């Protein structure tokens, strides 16, 4: 499965860079992962691969459990995605435009908390890792 985490902005904080690097390494056995950094949302949209299945992290989105993220989203894409790249979009400090919200197959939220967009990209990678482990029945997730 090809997964792209597409983000507005660069990651500069060394502790977040280290966390991202760790999860990218952990995800290697589960998917082909790319992280795309765009200067702005126009760049994010322009870089979407043809035929990509877009999921956007947005404060207006649905809060999913890790099980639902794994089975309903990752599992569904593995079985029915037809090999299309799966893109998880993270907006900048102001979130996503209506264009991205309309284009997305689903809006996903980490709840009603305000979370720095730089940290969200690490959280997305962690949930991808957890989701793939859940799908394979590997230990690590606790309900």
Give the label of every model feature segment.
Residues 1-23:
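N-terminal beta1-alpha1 ligand-phosphate binding loop
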Residues 5, 55, 91, 124:
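Conserved RecA-like P-loop NTPase ATPase core
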Residues 6-8, 36, 89:
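Short hydrophobic segments within beta-strands
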Residues 11, 59-62, 92-95:
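Short glycine-rich anion-binding loops that position phosphate/pyrophosphate groups of nucleotides
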Residues 16-20, 66-67, 101, 121:
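Conserved strand-to-helix beginnings and helix N-cap segments that scaffold or border functional pockets
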Residues 28-87:
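S-adenosyl-L-methionine/SAH cofactor-binding core of RNA-modifying enzymes
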Residues 68-99, 104-115:
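Catalytic beta-strand/loop module used to bind and position nucleotide/cofactor moieties
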Residues 99-142:
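Structured adenosyl-cofactor binding patch, chiefly the S-adenosyl-L-methionine
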């Amino acid at each position: 499965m090809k997964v792209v985490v597409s983000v507005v902005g660069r990651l500069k904080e060394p502790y977040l860079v280290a966390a991202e690097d760790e999860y990218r390494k952990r995800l290697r056995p589960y998917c082909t992962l790319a992280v795309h950094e765009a200067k702005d949302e126009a760049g994010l949209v322009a870089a979407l691969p043809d035929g990509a299945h877009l999921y956007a992290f947005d404060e207006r989105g649905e809060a999913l459990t890790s099980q639902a993220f794994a089975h309903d989203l990752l599992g569904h894409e593995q079985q029915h995605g037809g090999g299309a790249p799966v893109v998880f979009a993270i907006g900048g400090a102001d979130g996503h435009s209506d264009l991205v919200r309309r284009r997305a197959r689903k809006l996903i939220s980490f709840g009603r908390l305000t979370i720095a967009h730089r940290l969200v990209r690490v959280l997305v990678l962690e949930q991808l890792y957890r989701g793939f482990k859940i799908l394979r029945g590997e230990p690590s997730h606790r309900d």
